[in-house]
From Swiss-Prot:
Species assigned in the record: Salmonella arizonae (strain ATCC BAA-731 / CDC346-86 / RSK2980)
EC number: 2.4.1.325
Pfam family, one: Glyco_transf_56
Entry function: Catalyzes the synthesis of Und-PP-GlcNAc-ManNAcA-Fuc4NAc (Lipid III), the third lipid-linked intermediate involved in ECA synthesis.
Family in the record: Belongs to the glycosyltransferase 56 family.
Molecular-function annotations in GO: 4-acetamido-4,6-dideoxy-D-galactose transferase activity; fucosyltransferase activity
The name this protein goes by in its record: TDP-N-acetylfucosamine:lipid II N-acetylfucosaminyltransferase
């Protein structure tokens, strides 16, 4: 039997760390197809913190791709599970036959599916990538992303799968200690990445609420982002008074981030694609509604779970927000498909499919 190899093809520290810890802590002990990893980037202590995994690290995306292609050619029975796929060389290998479709299974992370960049090199590459995506052996994704993908590639198998958000199920039934009232606190974006379109989002929040709300913008991740943080702060202060604007430029530990989220009344996410599911889950768990772009297909996942969805095109007010909070509080969180531990069984199914052990 050939053991499935998992590929983290781009150096995205936060997401890669989440995936590796999830596999180490939850899947590896009971499934031999959950232990082998090829990772773009440095070790950064992963080998020590994830002893249940066999990890190989590569200094660049190109070096990793070359190693994957060599393994694929050496053994055509070898299958790979790509977690997110931000590696140009791997898409090209799928097109050229270096990796065969039956060897290539892909968990869509959102940004690797959508064609959001206006850069010339991206506009040139997107059509090529789109053709390659139609040749994969199968995809795993959110309901919304599966729907989006199926419109382009109806012949490719798709299975429901959610990113393994770190969650404490015991908090699902956490009682609201006091009735929410007073000035709203709005979380804008889920990180400091430009894909959050912070400036556009701040303008939209100001247009809806004026300078009457507290605005919190978490920008501690990614690192080396000070110039963009300063740009967002400058624009924010042109819209909101200093006491109503909080730009968080330092990376936060999970418990501190969780505490921050629970101080908010509303999450505002203007990006037009699926991303930030972890933050969305933690907000929903705390009965905090989220505003989504109508072009963000994750609203389909929320609607499927009977969760209230607010859109950036809605007329928002404190009354609307409080009503959404009330509706969220009435939902049985233990049944939400994309919450822990409910997302575990689809992961076991995905491993069997990618390994060729399930029809």
């Amino acid at each position: 039997m050939t053991v499935l190899i998992h590929v983290l093809g781009s150096d995205i520290p936060h997401h890669n760390h989440t995936v590796l810890r999830f596999f180490n802590d939850t899947l590896a002990s009971t499934n031999e197809h959950a232990r082998e990893f090829m990772v773009a980037g440095e070790d950064n202590g992963f080998t020590e913190s994830c002893p249940a995994l066999s990890l190989r690290f590569y200094g660049s995306k190109k070096a990793l791709a070359q190693a994957v292609i060599a393994k694929a050619k050496a053994n055509r029975r070898q299958r790979f599970f790509f977690h997110g796929q931000f590696n140009t060389s791997l898409w090209l290998a799928l097109l050229s036959g270096g990796i065969k479709p039956a060897q290539f299974y892909w968990h869509i992370w959102g940004a690797d599916l959508y064609e959001a960049s206006s850069g010339l090199k991206f506009r040139f590459f997107y059509p090529i990538r789109r053709i390659a995506q139609g040749r994969v052996g199968g995809v795993f994704a959110t309901r919304g992303d599966l729907s989006y993908f199926a419109r382009q590639h109806p012949g490719v198998r798709g299975e429901l799968l959610y990113f393994p958000t770190r969650m404490d199920p015991s908090l699902n039934s956490l009682a609201i200690e006091c009735q929410r009232a007073g000035k709203l606190t709005i979380l804008v974006g889920n990180s400091g990445d430009r894909s959050n379109e912070h400036i556009t989002a701040l303008r939209a929040v100001h247009q809806q609420f004026g300078d009457t709300v507290n605005v919190v913008v978490p920008m501690g991740y990614p690192a080396n982002n000070q110039a963009y943080i300063d740009e967002v702060r400058q624009e924010g202060l042109a819209l909101f008074s200093a006491e109503n604007l909080q730009i968080l430029s330092e990376k936060m530990e999970f418990d501190a981030y969780l505490a921050l989220l629970r101080q908010c009344d509303l999450g505002y996410f203007i990006f037009a694609r699926q991303q930030g599911i972890g933050t969305l889950c933690l907000l929903i768990q705390a009965n905090i509604p989220c505003v989504l772009n109508r072009d963000n297909p994750f609203w389909q996942d929320m609607a499927e779970q009977h969760l209230p969805v607010l859109f950036t095109t809605d007329d928002l007010s404190e009354r609307v927000v409080r009503e959404a909070q009330r509706q969220l509080a009435s939902v049985d969180k233990s049944g939400i498909t994309f919450f822990s531990p409910n997302y575990l069984q689809p992961w076991h199914n995905a491993l069997r499919i990618a390994a060729g052990e399930a029809e």
